[in-house]
Amino acid sequence: MQLTEQQHDKLSKVQLDESWKHSLAEFLVSSRMDELRQFLIEQKNQDKVIYPPSKQIFNALNTTPLSAVKVVILGQDPYHGPNQANGLSFSVQKGIVLPPSLRNIFHELNTDLGIPVPKHGDLTKWADQGVLLLNSVLTVEAGQPTSHQKRGWEQFTDSIIDVLNEQREHVVFILWGAYAQRKGQRIDREKHLVLKAAHPSPLAANRGGFFGCKVFSKTNNYLKQHGIEPIDWQLDA
């Protein structure tokens, strides 16, 4: 699309990896994004605490450029507790107690690949290798789960999925739970691999359908079949 001078100026102020910025430009300069920005400004003006910190809102995109994406793990919205969210879905800062969903993910990782259960929950190493850890909604108010849903983030992250769907091939989309699976209906199964399972939260996982899903080995097998370097899922101590 042809951008006006005003739109170019607006785009230049977005602190986002250039490959993503270029591909998402149409949304980033849209009225929907303006409304989302205004909502976040109003929240901060009301002294509401927003997670993750503003510099980490686009952490998933800035850590995993468009050309590097091999895998997408789609979450819902960020953790809403202090010092948990770091802009990567399911990930928490080092030194933070593992949330139940992440404990279950690590349990499945251990069962699937025999990898020792990590002692911390910082998934940056995965993101550095091409695992886009993307939440559907990128911000949340402290202590208020789902508080920033239906404010525009969903359309933004739909655009991210559309860009990957159209511009890339042989990406593995890991969709845990009904919410992620609905969002993933737009993915072209001819070009990409979609792996579905129950959500790793204790409530969902204990009903069955998560443990034993073997998404980690299935992901690496698919990548290797297409000549793509597999993911080293083992996290540093």
Curated annotation (Swiss-Prot):
Location of this chain's protein in the cell: Cytoplasm
Listed transmembrane segments: none
Entry EC no(s): 3.2.2.27
HAMAP family referenced in this protein's UniProt entry, alphabetically: UDG
Protein name: Uracil-DNA glycosylase
Family: Belongs to the uracil-DNA glycosylase (UDG) superfamily. UNG family.
Annotated NCBIfam families: PRK05254.1-1, PRK05254.1-2, PRK05254.1-4, PRK05254.1-5, ung
Organism lineage string: Bacteria, Pseudomonadati, Pseudomonadota, Gammaproteobacteria, Moraxellales
GO cellular component, one term: cytoplasm
